[in-house]
Amino acid sequence: MGKIHRPRRGSLAYSPRKRAKSIVPRIRSWPKDSEVRMLGFAGYKAGMTHILMIDDSPGLTKGKEIFVPVTIVEVPPLFVYGIRAYKQGYLGLETATEVWFHDLHKNVARRIKTLPKNYNEEAFQAKLGQLEDLVNDGEIADVRLLVHTQPWLIGLKKKPEVMEYAIGGDDVKAKFDYAKEKIGKELRAGEVLHEGELLDVIAVTKGKGTQGPVKRWGVKVQFHKAQRAGKGRHIGNLGPWHPARVMWTVPQAGQMGFHHRTEFNKRLIAIGENGKLVLDGNEIEITPKGGFPHYGIVRSDFLMIEGTIPGSFKRIIRVRPAIRPPKKKPPVERPQITYVSRESKQ
């Protein structure tokens, strides 16, 4: 008799498979980076195309022309609206104080309903000075940036997304000086990300509603004779007699998609500006003929990321520098691109 080997269907690592709390993904871990910069960026997924490039990664095809599918993420400038400072608490970092910029865009009130009233530049400078005193006294353990997106710049919508980003470096004073310089200003993707570096992509996947166990967990469709009882796309049984309950490990129907996911080590092929990519000294439009399906025209800055990423078109996508890069990684520079497909994706 042959070896009986039937591993369970589906991974329990992602259980419970339920909808994400928010469509704006969370980043709870940050890489260590010696460079003082904002550790990541955010944008909106436009669609996919493909390119031909000279492979510069270590491997059999190095130096040869290869086909690479890429995802385009439009990244209008982020606005730094605040600084959040943390102190060292008993169980880890605790919020110490925040400083918000005094002159915010009117659309921010659509997202933040509790904007401070009677808050002018004088009050802003006073709070900023108080925070600087805390930093100089050594009471602050970390400084991070509070930013919001500006989707109205690309004609997507009016309500922005707000989020927090860590700052690279080891010196808290250097982090504060960087935050002090950037507050109240726009940040573009080219200022904080480098072409060729590896990124982690964090997003909420496409929602697929309620699905059965075959599609949701990958269980086998039952043998045709077993289907004579009436159905075949279900599990054979719900488990043993004892323990006298249905265990949570049993693959059953339920919610599929709209899950919070992180995909590691996606290479940033190129960064474009104003919807255009510089190729061999010439500017070419990145938008394909007829526009990206369900999205339209890319008008602002964009990221060209290798491979696929989670989420549907127009969904908010967050990236950060790779937190666990491989030992053999490609050089941090733009690879030589020989062709970009602009054929219709309709």
Swiss-Prot record:
Residues 324-346 are annotated as: Disordered. It comes from the Archaea. InterPro entries: L3_arc_euk, Ribosomal_L3_dom_3_arc_sf, Ribosomal_uL3, Ribosomal_uL3_arc, Ribosomal_uL3_CS, Transl_B-barrel_sf. The keyword Ribonucleoprotein applies. One of its GO terms (biological process) is translation. GO terms for molecular function: RNA binding; rRNA binding; structural constituent of ribosome. GO terms for cellular component: cytosolic large ribosomal subunit. Keywords: Ribonucleoprotein, Ribosomal protein, RNA-binding, rRNA-binding. It holds the Pfam family Ribosomal_L3. Part of the 50S ribosomal subunit. Forms a cluster with proteins L14 and L24e. Belongs to the universal ribosomal protein uL3 family. One of the primary rRNA binding proteins, it binds directly near the 3'-end of the 23S rRNA, where it nucleates assembly of the 50S subunit. HAMAP family: Ribosomal_uL3_A (MF_01325_A). This is Large ribosomal subunit protein uL3. It comes from Thermococcus kodakarensis (strain ATCC BAA-918 / JCM 12380 / KOD1).
